[in-house]
Amino acid sequence: MRIKNKIKKRIIELIELAYITARKGDLELAREYIKLAEMYSRKGRIKIPLKYKRMFCRKCYTPLITGVTERRRIRSKILIRTCLICNWQRRYVLSRNKGSNKEN
């Protein structure tokens, strides 16, 4: 296995472990896991997959868990995700999936 694949696999493991740790209540340890994953990403020049990149706050590195560390609001087809620790906000445009409401 190539070294970049090993690093990417480790980054994903760390982010998933951070998410599990945060659910158990240890936010400081979860932040450290995410900071470590970010460091691996920078040093290895590897992009974090979008699915995992959206799992944590980019300002304070807290795993975003709806209702615990994150608030989600939908306003006029825009999803607003707010970190409850540092009040950082991220907006995503919501679009209808192609082919989901096709009439036959």
Curated annotation (Swiss-Prot):
Annotated catalysed reactions: Endonucleolytic cleavage of RNA, removing 5'-extranucleotides from tRNA precursor
Main location: cytoplasm
GO molecular function: ribonuclease P activity; zinc ion binding
Entry GO CC: cytoplasm; ribonuclease P complex
Subcellular location: Cytoplasm
Cofactors, names only: Zn(2+)
Keywords per UniProt: Cytoplasm, Endonuclease, Hydrolase, Metal-binding, Nuclease, tRNA processing, Zinc
InterPro entries registered for this protein in UniProt: RNP4, Rpr2/Snm1/Rpp21
Superkingdom of the source species: Archaea
EC code: 3.1.26.5
Annotated Zn(2+) binding sites: 57, 60, 83, 86
Biological processes per GO annotation: tRNA 5'-leader removal
Record note on cofactor: Binds 1 zinc ion per subunit.
Subunit structure: Consists of a catalytic RNA component and at least 4-5 protein subunits.
Entries under PANTHER family matching the protein: RIBONUCLEASE P PROTEIN SUBUNIT P21, RIBONUCLEASE P SUBUNIT P21
Record-stated family: Belongs to the eukaryotic/archaeal RNase P protein component 4 family.
HAMAP family: RNase_P_4 (MF_00757)
Chain's role: Part of ribonuclease P, a protein complex that generates mature tRNA molecules by cleaving their 5'-ends.
Protein name as annotated: Ribonuclease P protein component 4
Organism: Saccharolobus islandicus (strain L.S.2.15 / Lassen #1) (Sulfolobus islandicus)
Phylogenetic placement of the source organism: Archaea, Thermoproteota, Thermoprotei, Sulfolobales, Sulfolobaceae
